[in-house]
């Protein structure tokens, strides 16, 4: 993240300070999700998580270094909630039968590409600067659109919540 902030004109110290907000933003978002959205369907949390990064990225591209911290707060919040949604949304969509095996099939590719993403994105940032954010904006918006097409069966009375 600091390299991205340098690309939009942030001073080195400001870039590092903004990037340091990532962890606190993730934790704060998880606490808010647990307290404010605990009775909501995980699909709502997934949609909110998917829009957070694109919103922050557009603001960063439009306004530059002064909103680097806001970008990190939104990006971190979305990332933090996504870690919860990765477990709760498949359970809500598919139910508890075969949950472990299904999660393994879902999580394996995610972990693989998640491990590659920082290095690959670093290469893209080196080549395109802050404009590399358009790639992440597009990917997150594609995920958001997919979530709007996701059909969830109503929960049965005996289904765990």
Question: Where are the regions a protein language model picked out?
Answer:
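Helix-loop junctions at membrane interfaces in 12-TM secondary transporters
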Residues: 62-71
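Short amphipathic helix-loop junctions that connect adjacent transmembrane helices
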Residues: 1-13
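Symmetry-related core transmembrane helices of the 12-TM Major Facilitator Superfamily/SLC fold
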Residues: 132-149
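Helix-to-loop junctions at the C-terminal end of transmembrane segments
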Residues: 29-42, 125-126
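Structural signature of the two symmetry-related core transmembrane helices
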Residues: 44-59
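A late C-terminal transmembrane helix in Major Facilitator Superfamily
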Residues: 96-128
């Amino acid at each position: 993240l600091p390299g991205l902030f340098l690309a939009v004109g942030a001073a080195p110290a400001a870039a590092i300070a903004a990037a340091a907000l990532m962890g606190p933003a993730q934790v704060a978002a998880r606490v808010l999700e647990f307290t404010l959205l605990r009775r909501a369907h995980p699909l709502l949390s997934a949609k909110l998580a998917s829009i957070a990064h694109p919103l922050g990225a557009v603001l960063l591209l439009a306004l530059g270094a002064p909103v680097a911290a806001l970008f990190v707060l939104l990006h971190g919040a979305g990332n933090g909630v996504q870690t919860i949604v990765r477990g709760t949304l498949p359970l809500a969509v598919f139910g508890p039968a075969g949950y472990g095996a299904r999660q393994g099939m879902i999580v394996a590719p995610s972990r693989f590409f998640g491990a590659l993403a920082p290095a690959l994105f670093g290469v893209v940032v080196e080549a395109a600067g802050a404009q590399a954010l358009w790639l992440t904006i597009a990917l997150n918006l594609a995920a958001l659109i997919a979530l709007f097409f996701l059909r969830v069966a109503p929960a049965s009375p005996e289904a765990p919540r």
